[in-house]
């Protein structure tokens, strides 16, 4: 190549032979976080807890930290369900209402039969059914996920109101169900243990199975995934079904905490929290990228913020504002990360 047509800034031959200058520590750290945002989320959570321990009275007590994790347990499970849906470039807005419906179905069945196992099975089947319906409408009828799940939100809410006659239903006393809320394993609440078990199973499914690889492939590009042999329709319906089932499990966990079935147990607030936990945890709204550990940390971050607001006796409206800010920041970070990774490849 001559000097006339040589691109501006291209190094000379002598400079090409010079050893590359290693990147600075900050640059290397930022690149590592870009490729594995869970590390950055963990650092953020640790900083939040450190600041809260200094600023917020009673935050750093053992009982309060246990309470934060207990409150994050059901949100974590629901957010993992949302993760599966977001990974295929979908979204589930029916989560909050399915929470309430599942809670009411659980308590109503328990009142009618006195059989806790049957009540939980019916509750889980309810969540599964809504997930399958959501996925089927999105895949086969071609209704956008946003519209489908929003409509199913109102259907679930109406059913919960009709079944309960608009009133909260007291859960019949059951030692096992009460123990789920009050018991612990080596000091760790059973609800947290259950959330951890669900998280481990979900991680294995996404990272160690053909189905998990298919989920990510569908999220990146459905056409390419289909040409590669992935059964795209089955994956889409399955992810919505998993999301509905996870929502039902989360509702059972929350019902055990309050020992009451309430038609308004979830609502749009729960839906928004679930999506926020997933997005703050590094899940892309554009599909194909997300992790179970990130979602867990996102849920704990959300519950930490809520706990601090309560302890500081600040208006709950601030919590909603913070949640809105978090999801906007998370979307900006996701956009910049996607651009950075695109430039590096």
PLM region spans:
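Hydrophobic core segments of alpha-helical transmembrane domains in multi-pass membrane transport
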Residues: 41-53, 82, 153, 157, ...
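Transmembrane helix-bundle core of multi-pass membrane transporters
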Residues: 145-208, 235-238, 257-267, 342-345
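Inter-helical junctions in multi-pass inner-membrane proteins, predominant
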Residues: 55-67, 160-165, 181-184, 205-212, ...
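Short loop segments and helix-boundary regions at transmembrane helix junctions
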Residues: 27-34, 86-91, 111, 128-170, ...
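Transmembrane alpha-helical segments in multi-pass inner-membrane proteins
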Residues: 247, 258, 262-323
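Cytosolic-side transmembrane-helix boundaries in multi-pass membrane proteins
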Residues: 1-48, 220, 227-234, 305-345
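Helix-loop-helix "hairpin" substructures at the membrane interface of multi-pass membrane proteins
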Residues: 115, 119-123, 129-134, 138, ...
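Single transmembrane alpha-helix segments in multi-pass membrane proteins
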Residues: 46-112, 136-142, 275-293, 325, ...
């Amino acid at each position: 190549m001559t000097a006339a047509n040589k691109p501006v800034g291209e190094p000379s031959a002598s400079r090409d032979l010079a050893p590359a200058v290693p990147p600075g520590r900050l640059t290397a750290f930022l690149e590592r976080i870009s490729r594995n945002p869970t590390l950055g989320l963990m650092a953020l959570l640790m900083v939040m807890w450190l600041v809260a321990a200094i600023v917020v009275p009673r935050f750093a007590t053992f009982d309060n930290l246990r309470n934060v994790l207990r409150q994050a347990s059901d949100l974590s499970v629901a957010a993992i369900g949302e993760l599966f849906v977001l990974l295929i470039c979908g979204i589930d807005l029916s989560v909050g209402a399915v929470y309430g419906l599942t809670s009411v179905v659980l308590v109503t069945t328990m009142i009618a039969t006195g059989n806790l196992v049957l009540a939980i099975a019916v509750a889980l089947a309810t969540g599964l059914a809504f997930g399958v319906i959501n996925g089927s409408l999105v895949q086969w009828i071609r209704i956008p996920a946003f519209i489908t799940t929003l409509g199913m939100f109102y259907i679930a809410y109406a059913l919960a109101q009709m079944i309960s006659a608009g009133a909260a239903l007291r859960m019949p006393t059951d030692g096992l169900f009460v123990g789920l809320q009050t018991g612990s394993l080596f000091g760790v609440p059973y609800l947290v243990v259950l959330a951890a078990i669900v998280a481990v199973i979900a991680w294995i499914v996404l990272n160690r199975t053909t189905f998990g690889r298919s989920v990510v492939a569908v999220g990146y590009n459905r056409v390419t995934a289909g040409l590669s042999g992935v059964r795209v329709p089955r994956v889409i319906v399955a992810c919505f079904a998993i999301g509905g089932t996870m929502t039902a499990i989360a509702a059972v966990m929350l019902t055990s905490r309050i020992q009451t079935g309430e038609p308004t147990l979830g609502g749009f607030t729960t839906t928004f929290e679930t999506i926020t936990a997933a997005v703050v945890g590094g899940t892309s709204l554009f599909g194909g990228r997300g992790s179970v550990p990130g979602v867990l940390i996102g849920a704990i971050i959300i519950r930490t913020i809520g706990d601090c607001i309560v302890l500081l006796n600040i208006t709950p409206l601030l919590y909603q504002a913070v949640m809105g800010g978090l999801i906007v920041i998370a979307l900006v970070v996701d956009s910049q990360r996607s651009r950075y990774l695109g430039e590096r490849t």
